[in-house]
């Protein structure tokens, strides 16, 4: 094993490559671990060695563990400037997930009409007067809150992207 310096962006590219490599070996194992042969023919036995394939998969898994652990340590120990304060990368990721969920709710609310007619069915004999559904909030306030949350997410993403492209950390692989 050797010590390697990488950024978070590069580490994620390495992880994708390792995942592809692992899928290759898993497919090789799946296709080579068994074969079918007719009783009256010479079997065509696939080129497969369990020990070799299992070793390759284990080596890839070990590298994945090391890189993900280094990313996690990096994410919980290093801080970046976000707005007027600082947050760990881990905190930024959690906060962004929360804000994205909130943004989805605000998006739904901002798209509501202040007054909507409710269809009670054509053949309803109980009600003759139409019914309306009204929003119970300040639509302009919600629109403003949506824009604020969207801008906060964008600022966090820009800070995170800059960090992921520039900050280097050590990984033993």
Regions found by a protein language model. Give the residues of each.
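Structural preference for solvent-exposed beta-strand-turn elements
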Residues: 1-173
């Amino acid at each position: 094993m050797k010590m390697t310096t990488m950024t978070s962006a590069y580490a994620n590219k390495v992880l994708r490559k390792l995942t592809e490599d692992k899928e290759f070996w898993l497919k090789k194992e799946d296709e080579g671990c068994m074969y079918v042969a007719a009783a009256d023919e010479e079997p065509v036995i696939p080129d497969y060695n369990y020990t070799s394939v299992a070793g390759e998969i284990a080596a890839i898994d070990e590298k994945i563990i090391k890189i993900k652990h280094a990313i996690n340590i990096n994410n919980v120990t290093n801080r970046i400037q976000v707005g007027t304060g600082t947050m760990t990368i881990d905190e930024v990721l959690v906060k962004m997930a929360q804000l994205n969920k909130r943004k989805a709710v605000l998006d739904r609310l901002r798209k509501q009409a202040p007054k909507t007619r409710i269809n009670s069915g054509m053949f309803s004999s109980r009600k003759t007067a139409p019914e309306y559904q009204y929003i119970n909030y300040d639509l302009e306030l919600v629109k403003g809150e949506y824009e604020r949350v969207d801008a906060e997410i964008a600022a966090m993403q820009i800070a995170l992207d800059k960090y992921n492209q520039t900050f280097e950390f050590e990984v033993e692989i």
